[in-house]
C-alpha cells in the first residue's frame, strides 16, 4: 500500500510525498506547469531555453559550483521540458535528499540568468536544434504535430526555431517568468526513503515564501485538429513517416482502454503492425504506434521508416491493421497480452523512486489526486474485447489522417491526397 501525503501551502504550492522505507534512494522533482503551449509564437522555445538557464548560475553559485554540488550529492540531476511542463529533478542516496531539495530550490528560485551565460547557452541550444534536425525519425514527429495542430502552440516544436533562440534576451526571460511562473503552478514531488518530520518543515521553509505575482497569464486555448499531408524533401535512404489523428485527452475515462487498443496495434514486437510489416514481410526495421495526451486533447500516432520503394506498401499495411480493429473483433489473447505489457510497465516502474516521483507529480497535475496502483490495475483488468473495438470505432473509424514524412519527394506522390483510417 502506497504511503502518499499531499500538502497545499498557503501560496498554492502543492507538495506530494510518498515514503518508501525499504529503498536507499530518494527522488525529488520540481514540476512547473508551464511548457511550450504557454508561449506565443515569438516566444516559442523560451520554456526550454529557461530550463537550460536554470543550471547556469544562482546568487551564491556559478555554473561550475552548481555542477560540483550536483557531483557531490551523486545520483542523477536532470531536467526536461514538454508541451505542458518543465521538470527539475534529482535522484540521490537518501542521506543527500535535504541537500538535493535545497539545490533544486536554489536553481528554481535564485537563478541569475546572466547575460554572458545566456549567450553561451544560446549556442548550446542552437547546436541541440541542429542535432535534432539531423535525426529525421524524431523530427518527423514534430512535423506531424505541426500539421495536426496547425496554428496552435501544441503544434510548435518544444525547442523552438533558431530565429527565436537567436533573439531571446534576459528581459524576455524575466517577463516570461513573471507572467507564467507562479506558486500555484508548482508541484514538488518526492518519493523514496525519507523522514517526513524533517522533510515537511524544510519544504515549508523553502517554498512557502514564494509570493504570487498577480500577472495576467497567456490564455490556454483548446486546439482544433486539422488534416493534411506533407513531405520534407531530403535525399535519404529511408522515408521516415508519421501519421495519425487526434485522440483522447489525458483525463479521459477512455485512456486505459485506448492504451490497450494502441498496444495491440503497435506497442511492441508482438503488436499487429510490427508483426505484419517487419516480421512477416521484412519491410521496415522500426515501426509502431503510440499516443500522446495533454490536458484537453491528445493524438494517436503510427510512425516508422521504410525504403522509398516500399513506403506505399508499408503505409497501406498500417492502414489495413487500423481498420481491422473496428471491422473484426480482437481476441481475448490479444487483450490479455496488452494488459500484461501495460501492467508490467506500471509495476516495474514502482521499483524505481524516480518513476514513482514522476507518477505522483503527473497525477497531481492532471487529476488533482493520486490514483493507487491497485486501482489502475483493476481498471486495466476490466478492459474487454468489446471496449477495444469501441475505442477503434470512436477514435479511429473513418477519421481523417494527418501524414508527415521526410524523404525523397518521389516517395510522397501516393500520399499527396487525403488519407483516412
Predicted regions and their residues:
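Charge-rich, well-structured scaffold segments of protease-associated domains
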Residues: 2-4, 8, 19, 63-215, ...
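Catalytic cores of enzymes that engage adenine nucleotides and/or redox cofactors via long glycine-rich
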Residues: 223-225, 276
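Active/ligand-binding-proximal structured segments within catalytic/core domains
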Residues: 12, 19-70, 144, 243, ...
Amino acid at each position: 500500500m502506497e504511503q502518499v501525503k499531499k500538502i497545499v501551502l498557503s501560496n498554492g504550492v502543492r507538495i506530494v510525498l510518498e515514503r518508501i522505507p525499504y529503498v536507499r534512494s530518494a527522488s525529488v522533482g520540481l514540476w512547473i506547469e508551464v511548457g511550450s503551449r504557454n508561449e506565443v509564437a515569438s516566444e516559442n522555445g523560451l520554456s526550454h531555453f529557461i530550463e537550460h538557464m536554470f543550471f547556469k548560475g544562482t546568487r551564491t553559485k556559478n555554473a561550475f559550483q552548481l555542477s560540483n554540488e550536483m557531483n557531490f550529492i551523486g545520483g542523477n540531476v536532470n531536467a526536461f521540458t514538454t508541451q505542458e511542463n518543465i521538470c527539475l529533478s534529482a535522484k540521490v542516496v537518501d542521506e543527500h535528499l535535504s541537500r538535493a531539495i535545497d539545490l533544486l530550490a536554489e536553481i528554481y528560485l535564485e537563478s541569475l540568468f546572466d547575460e554572458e551565460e545566456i549567450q553561451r547557452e544560446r549556442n548550446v541550444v542552437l547546436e541541440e536544434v541542429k542535432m535534432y534536425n539531423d535525426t529525421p525519425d524524431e523530427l518527423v514527429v514534430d512535423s506531424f504535430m505541426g500539421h495536426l495542430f496547425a496554428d496552435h502552440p501544441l503544434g510548435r516544436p518544444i525547442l523552438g526555431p533558431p530565429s527565436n533562440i537567436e533573439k531571446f534576451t534576459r528581459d524576455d526571460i524575466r517577463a516570461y517568468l513573471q507572467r507564467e511562473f507562479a506558486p500555484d503552478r508548482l508541484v514538488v514531488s518526492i518519493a523514496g526513503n525519507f523522514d517526513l518530520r524533517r522533510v515537511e518543515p524544510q519544504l515549508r521553509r523553502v517554498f512557502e515564501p514564494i509570493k504570487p505575482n498577480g500577472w495576467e497569464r497567456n490564455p490556454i486555448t483548446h486546439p482544433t485538429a486539422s488534416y493534411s499531408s506533407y513531405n520534407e524533401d531530403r535525399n535519404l535512404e529511408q522515408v521516415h513517416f508519421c501519421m495519425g489523428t487526434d485522440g483522447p485527452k489525458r483525463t479521459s475515462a477512455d485512456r486505459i482502454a485506448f492504451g490497450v487498443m494502441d498496444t495491440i496495434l503497435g506497442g511492441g514486437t508482438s503488436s499487429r503492425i510490427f508483426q505484419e510489416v517487419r516480421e512477416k514481410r521484412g519491410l521496415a526495421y522500426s515501426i509502431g504506434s503510440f499516443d500522446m495526451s495533454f490536458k484537453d486533447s491528445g493524438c494517436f500516432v503510427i510512425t516508422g521508416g521504410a525504403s522509398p520503394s516500399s513506403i506505399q506498401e508499408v503505409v497501406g499495411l498500417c492502414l489495413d491493421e487500423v481498420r481491422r480493429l473496428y471491422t473484426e473483433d480482437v481476441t481475448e489473447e490479444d487483450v490479455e497480452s496488452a494488459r500484461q505489457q501495460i501492467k508490467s510497465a506500471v509495476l516495474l516502474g514502482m521499483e524505481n523512486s524516480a518513476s514513482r516521483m514522476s507518477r505522483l507529480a503527473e497525477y497531481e497535475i492532471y487529476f488533482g489526486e493520486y490514483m493507487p496502483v491497485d486501482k489502475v490495475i483493476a481498471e486495466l483488468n476490466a478492459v474487454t474485447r468489446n471496449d477495444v473495438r469501441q475505442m477503434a470505432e470512436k477514435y479511429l473509424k473513418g477519421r481523417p489522417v494527418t501524414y508527415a514524412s521526410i524523404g525523397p519527394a518521389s516517395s510522397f506522390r501516393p500520399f499527396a491526397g487525403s488519407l483516412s483510417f
